Regions:
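Helix-loop-strand module that forms the ligand-binding subsite of alpha/beta enzymes
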Residues: 55-130
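Glycine-rich phosphate/pyrophosphate-binding loop and the adjoining helix
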Residues: 2-7, 55, 134-183
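N-terminal first-folded block
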Residues: 35-46, 69
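A generic structural motif
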Residues: 31-37, 132-133
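N-terminal beta-loop-helix "entrance" segment that forms/cooperates
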Residues: 41-58, 148-151
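Short hydrophobic segments within beta-strands
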Residues: 9-11, 39, 109
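N-terminal beta1-alpha1 ligand-phosphate binding loop
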Residues: 2-33
Length: 183
């Protein structure tokens, strides 16, 4: 049984998204004591409306439950018009008032070296939400234009090494959080 569970969210709704493929490769590369729970419900979340919070839709409750059960969160996202995709920002808006996110270790991945604005916007949003951003585990994996699927990413020595190292750093950061909380 895995000792760590990491919720992974792709910021893209596109079929065969390079960011989703990156997360699938990360899952394939994870050690047997780490489980990657790939969330695929961004398209089922209603538009954020604070009036709906007292009677949260089932899709929102599912996201919050899965985040609450996870030891950490990894987001891999494209950049649209120098910003975060609306569907991803919508999901974060649903999480902002809950306790599930507080002090949750968070890492960011990007499949494009041209996503610096979205990366910074996400980092700002996540730290504003009281997430614990793990910069050392947040990386850009240059996949744009390479048309690689998850098995090809996982099989590539350079890419798989970078992903494994980022995941190892992230898991150690989660472990340090747990050890500090046990004291």
């Amino acid at each position: 049984m895995p000792s760590l569970t990491i919720l992974a969210i792709s910021g893209s709704l596109r079929a065969r998204s390079t960011n989703t493929e990156l997360l699938l490769a990360l899952s394939a590369l994870a050690s047997e004591d780490t489980s990657i729970d790939l969330y695929d419900g961004l398209d089922r979340l209603p538009h954020f409306n604070p009036d709906l919070e007292p009677t949260e839709p089932a899709s929102v409750m599912d996201l919050k439950r899965r985040l609450g059960e996870a030891d950490g969160l990894i987001i891999s996202s494209p950049e649209y018009a120098r910003g975060v995709p609306g569907s991803l920002k919508n999901a974060l808006d649903w999480l902002v008032s809950g306790s599930e996110f507080v002090d949750k270790p968070v890492a960011l991945l990007s499949a494009s070296s041209r996503s610096t604005y979205a990366f910074e916007a996400l980092r700002t949003t996540l730290t504003t939400m009281s997430g614990r951003f793990v910069a050392e585990a947040s990386i850009t994996v240059p996949l744009l234009g390479r048309n690689l699927d998850a098995p090809a990413i996982a099989a590539d020595p350079e890419l798989s090494s970078a992903l494994r190292e980022a995941l190892d750093v992230f898991c150690r950061a989660i472990g340090q959080r747990g050890a500090a909380g046990d004291e």
